[in-house]
């Protein structure tokens, strides 16, 4: 586990959480009507690189963002920046390290980033806060979760954040517990590869750049050796922007690592087992129809799952 002292944060200010984020049940998926900032310059690289550039600008207290509004994925990137800016509006880089931002309802908030875009990690973040209830607010998805683990000692609180490569998070310490769900603790040893039948049309070529090209996977049978709690499609080493539909369900645009989606919500599993003998191979199976719209390059597509 990596230990990070939070060295980047924001000066104290007062701003109503409800004015920025709405009620907790709505997450913070809907910023105020004026929250869509205008892009100030053209895109100069892939979205993941722009995200890191924007993170740096936000931490430095700058308002400019790098994004071409006509570029695929620009809407998601602009929404991401809007969430960041409007949550910490009127703030600037703090003179004192790990100074948080205090809101009118007593919530104290911090902003942190995972420094690498190469691998996921369980990151331990250390904050000068006690007696409050920590939550992890994901600006990329709008989800609000309780950390999988947290502890208090010596006037500080340590929060474990299961961070994806290059991810950012708001760590919010609330005065009262909320209905936020606990973040799942996913171990690499739990994830297993899944064999899927069927073919792509056309067959994608790994590490080849595509512009607005659609690939379809159909007539496949997604079969699992147990009962799935999560099921993923993984685009491997990818760069660019990708839109994915599974069995007609549209998922959030992928524009930064990890280029992986949990598609379990789009799968209607049925029991798969025809024997009552001890040790029989009983699991789940589901039809699988995928539409992948690619603006960029991706690696070998794989399927993974966590099964009970």
Where are the model-predicted features located?
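Short, well-structured beta-strand segments enriched in hydrophobic/aromatic residues
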Residues: 168-174, 229-231, 282-292
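A short acidic/small-residue loop/turn micro-motif
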Residues: 152-153, 176-177, 252-260
């Amino acid at each position: 586990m990596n230990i990070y002292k939070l060295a980047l944060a924001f000066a104290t200010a007062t701003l109503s959480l409800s004015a920025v984020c709405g009620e907790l049940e709505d997450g913070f998926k809907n910023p105020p009507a004026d929250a869509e900032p205008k892009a100030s310059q053209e895109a100069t690289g892939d979205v993941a690189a722009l995200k890191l550039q924007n993170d740096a600008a936000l931490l430095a207290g700058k308002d400019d963002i790098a994004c071409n509004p006509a570029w695929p994925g620009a809407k998601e990137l602009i929404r991401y920046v809007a969430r960041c800016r409007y949550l910490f509006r009127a703030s600037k880089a703090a003179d004192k390290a790990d100074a948080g931002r205090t809101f009118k309802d007593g919530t104290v908030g911090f902003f942190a980033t995972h420094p690498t875009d190469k691998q996921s990690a369980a990151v331990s973040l250390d904050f000068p806060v006690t007696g409050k209830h920590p939550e992890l607010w994901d600006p990329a998805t709008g989800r609000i979760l309780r950390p999988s683990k947290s502890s208090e000692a010596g006037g500080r609180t340590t929060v474990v954040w299961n961070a994806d490569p290059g991810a950012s998070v708001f760590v919010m310490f609330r005065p009262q517990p909320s209905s936020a769900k606990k973040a799942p603790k996913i171990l690499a040893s739990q994830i297993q590869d899944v064999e899927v039948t069927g073919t792509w049309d056309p067959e994608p070529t790994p590490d080849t750049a595509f512009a607005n090209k659609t690939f379809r996977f159909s007539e496949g049978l997604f079969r699992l050796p147990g009962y799935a709690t999560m099921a993923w499609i993984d685009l491997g080493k990818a760069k660019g922007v990708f839109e994915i539909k599974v069995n007609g369900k549209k998922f959030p645009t992928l524009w930064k690592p990890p280029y992986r989606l949990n598609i379990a919500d789009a799968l209607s599993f049925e029991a798969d087992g025809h024997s009552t003998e001890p040790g029989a191979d009983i699991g789940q199976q589901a039809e699988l129809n995928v539409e992948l719209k690619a603006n960029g390059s991706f690696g070998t597509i794989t399927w993974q799952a966590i099964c009970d």
